[in-house]
Amino acid sequence: MTTDLQAELETEVERRRNFAIISHPDAGKTTLTEKLLLYGGAIHEAGAVKARRAQRHATSDWMEMEQQRGISITSTVLQFEYQGYQINLLDTPGHQDFSEDTYRTLAAADNAVMLVDAAKGLEPQTRKLFEVCKLRSLPIFTFINKLDRPGREPLDLLDEIEKELGLQTYAVNWPIGMGDRFKGVYDRRLQQIHLFERTAHGKREARDTIVDLGDPQIEALLDQDLYFQLKDDLELIEGLGPELDLEAVHQGKMTPIFFGSAMTNFGVELFLNAFLDYALKPATYRSSQGAIAPTHEDFSGFVFKLQANMDPKHRDRVAFVRVCAGKFEKDMTVNHARTGKMIRLSRPQKLFAQGRESLETAYAGDVIGLNNPGVFAIGDTIYSGQKLEYEGIPCFSPELFAYLRNPNPSKFKQFQKGVSELREEGAVQIMYSVDESKREPILAAVGQLQFEVVQFRLQNEYGVETRIELLPYTVARWVVEGWPALEAVGRIFNAVTVKDSWGRPVLLFKNEWNAQQVLADHPKLKLSGIAPVVSGQQPEAL
């Protein structure tokens, strides 16, 4: 590698930050996302998801169904520059049914921002997604939101995070008041108080007044009881709390805590500035050739998401690629690890929700969009130089199952195409009966909304009306050693055998007790709730 290329890679990696936001539904994730874009200059006016119809929808919620319901259904990528940093914000679905898409997105993230509602504290979806982050040892930054509404005491929230998640906490800033009496935050880094002025629904950057803690006018600006409460709180957290340990943060053992209100812009800019200082830059990734450093001279990356019809006018399909190492350049030729073919990447795109623009170069930590004419699958590796393959992305175990019926035979081709493309992008898992007379696909989902999304998109994007016929199963287990192991045990009671999109055997059970009973009856049978990694394999044709 030339000295110039080495210096270029080191410089570009150093200025990149990549993160995903995780939260329970309604914690304010889409709002925080838009406010970060507002401060980053990527948008000039934030559009609230629940705004009036005359106002535009949230930038990150681009699918028609998202705009109708005011929820995030798909993961999107939002890239922008801020204070010399190149930021890749991986916006994840906020609805609990879409944890699979979130898992795939977290596989491409270097950091996670955990959004917590100040009134509700930790909620089930937040805990579940935290466990996924913990598996990857992702650094976690916590933003406690909605301080402009009545909520729980800040110390109680920190205590809950420490006890339930096993994380040390360090409050980077501290709230002054709450609800109607919320006055702003104290920045412990610079020992300054930020007093915020509410903007019109937080559409523009907040104009804040910054005052040193020792300034004589503080008592006049704050209610006296809030002033003394702040002094008492600071004395407590600085006397008893730990020091900020960035090594522990980067190992996922300590979480920096920020307080604010995304809707009214309180604390958002403070969070963004501190995050850029503290967050982990693009990290190494494990591969078949060992750990690959982001400054490795050869380009490599992996596909973590596929999305069809992001632009309905063009009926396109886009592969989202996380760049892991080296320098990506437009028109470069790369190796496709799964097929062994050489591919010329002639139309790479910089992504911003559903918007696209041509891309010339990209570096580790960036996410690029590639036109996908059926070439790429989730988990695929592309590379230049020495052959390698990154670790695949496992699937969640589904909990709801249903036959998907096509009542109109004249729409068979559109039905097949729609199901195939939605399967490829991971909108839902597809399984099939081993009974050859039953050709209808079985939808396997982690929540009811996934069924609704599949039906909506088949109608909206492919012109196909469908019917759902629910099945009485709630547990799926993959047979670890495949068909030979299943045939060796003979007949199995209280289970039905199906095959997944890769032709692998899956047992469906009505409940967990039945699954445990089968294991007790057949001790040599090995079952797994997580699908085998799919890297290097293409689903069977429909």
Curated annotation (Swiss-Prot):
Binding-site residues, GTP: 23-30, 91-95, 145-148
Gene3D superfamilies: P-loop containing nucleotide triphosphate hydrolases, Peptide chain release factor 3, domain III, Translation factors
Record bears the keyword DNA damage: no
GO biological process: regulation of translational termination
Alphabetic keyword roster: Cytoplasm, GTP-binding, Nucleotide-binding, Protein biosynthesis
Annotated compartments: Cytoplasm
InterPro entries for this protein: EF-G-like_DII, EFG_III/V, G_TR_CS, P-loop_NTPase, PrfC, RF3_C, RF3_dom_3_sf, RF3_GTP-bd
Signal peptide: none
Keyword Kinase carried by entry: no
Pfam families: EF-G_D2 (PF22042), GTP_EFTU (PF00009), RF3_C (PF16658)
Domain spans labelled tr-type G: 14-283
Major place of residence: cytoplasm
Stated family: Belongs to the TRAFAC class translation factor GTPase superfamily. Classic translation factor GTPase family. PrfC subfamily.
HAMAP family: Rel_fac_3
PANTHER family given in the database record: PEPTIDE CHAIN RELEASE FACTOR RF3
Protein's name in the database: Peptide chain release factor 3
